Amino acid sequence: MLREELNEKDTWDLTTIFANNEEFEKAFNNANIEIENIKKYENIMINSSDELYQTTKTIYEVGEKIDRIYTYANLKYSEDTSNNDSQTLMGRAQELYKKFSEATVFYDTKLISLDEETFEKYISENKNLREYEIVLRNAYKYKPHTLSDAEEKLLAAFQKERGTASDIYETFTASDLTFGKIKDENGKEVELTDTNYSLYMKSQNPEVRKSAFKTLYKTYEQYQNTFASIYAGQIEVEKTCAKVRGYKSAMEAALFADDVTPEVYDNIVNSISNHLDVLFKYYRMKKRVLGLNDMHIYDVYVPLISNFERNYTYDEAVNEVLEATHIFGDEYVNILKQGYKDRWVDVYPNKGKRGGAFSGGCATTNPFILLNFQGTEYDVSTLAHESGHSMHSYFTRKNNPLQYADYRIFVAEVPSTVNELVLAYYRLEHTENKLEKLSILNSLLELYKATIYRQIMFAEFEKTTHELSEKGEVLTAELLNKEYYEINEKYFGGEIILDKEISYEWMRIPHFYYNFYVYKYAIGLTGASKIVKRIRAKEPHALEDYFEFLKIGNKKNPIESLKVAGVDFTNTNVFDSAIQIFDELIDEFEKLYKEL
């Protein structure tokens, strides 16, 4: 379907950002002028607390105008990436953003050049400046890790090269690897790719699963030394950069921005290690349901039950999400309902439209949602998920000034996952169809297994490999394969036959090049589980705590923000609620399955 063939009510209303092209061009031209005016602050910024306030205030105000322009261009481009006008618009917005970044590059350097006594004096003496205290402290905290101007320029010159290992990995895996052919369920010879591999791992035919598994990893085995060199190079660069900047480790450097300590990271990994018995219970149940005497590692992705698929109209999806979120009260539902009515959502696929789904916007726009809705249960869950992001953005922006009207990636997946969970519970409670219930339970079980256990397994491997490197160990393919196999032994606990090829799986995980990122996936589901458990149990202040969390923005760091919602990642029992839910879901699935 072409963009112009869509019904207007099913598209997002971007006229709420700019009513027409003239408005956009006026804003664009004014922004260019204001960017030039920022440059005058460079030499006076730290002369007094008032100059620091004026500089900071101006940068945030101009930055928001740039964000508004960029948001408009990005959303126009996303709705039809093949449209020449939208391509041009996007290019112009990107150049404007680059110009703004270059014009403000002096800010952090100047701020950090203040001695601590003067920095504290400026904040204490200036009431207006104290409105920006948290963002100022977030920038100033890098002072001990900032080098001289000459050294910083030298490091900046190598910034592109810092991503070389990741670039090589991406190019090599996307363009150069081939995996040969396998026979599918119908005996037809098909080309195996890294993309369709996951489909064959869910095949009901064990020979197809085995063939896909063995064939894929045969290729990775051939290039194991190359992958080891790439990954070791990535770790070496991050280790060196951390050392140069005065961090104790690459882990400490990577976690520093979110105010997360290595101790908190270790607590997260260790907490899951204390709950592996529930994961083993899941695999034992899966083995029984699938009727397998022996369960190989290539059997773990087979669905417990073929998905029960309902078809939804978009209106039905909206109604189901609104009904499910009634658990949060009328205020939440009424705002979301009005958002749908006010065309926050771009609903259907069209030619040239960006794939997938996202929630996007900035502090002065609506929290728009892009979907590619085709009526599946997954699409309804996606609507709930993205609506969770958008409602988080709505409450954050409505309750904070510009400088705090956003939130960090660390907490971003919590409200979206909360919505996914309440939708799943709503569905379970409002259907009598046992197959549908089993399908929902199967999806939830896979969600917990993949998002908590698997991601933390990756996080543990990443921690181990960095520690080995920092001890002076050479990260050979043999060593990496051994460490990865042993971590798999720990997480599969003798319940699964670990074919030797699983040793090579670390080679196909791109997240290891994101530098201590994977643990954040577990944060979202763990936090959401605790919040939903509290709300469903009608714990005192559970709803109030959740709304306070939604409204807090960047006024607190991520760990402290989640504490407001009743989730404490410094506590060793932080995963208890999520694991308890996982445990209960296993029991519920098996009990219901026996009733078929």
PLM feature spans:
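C-terminal, non-catalytic "cap/extension" segments appended to globular domains
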Residues: E4-L6, Y107-L114, N126, I134-K141, ...
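Post-HEXXH active-site segment of zinc metalloproteases
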Residues: S381-T382, S393-T417
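Long, K/E/R/D-enriched contiguous segments that form extended
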Residues: M285, V289-I327, V333-N334, H392, ...
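Active-site metal-coordination segments of metallo-dependent hydrolases
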Residues: Q403-P415, L447, A477, Y514-Y521
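Short pre-active-site segment immediately N-terminal to the catalytic Zn-binding motif
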Residues: E309-Y314, T364-A384
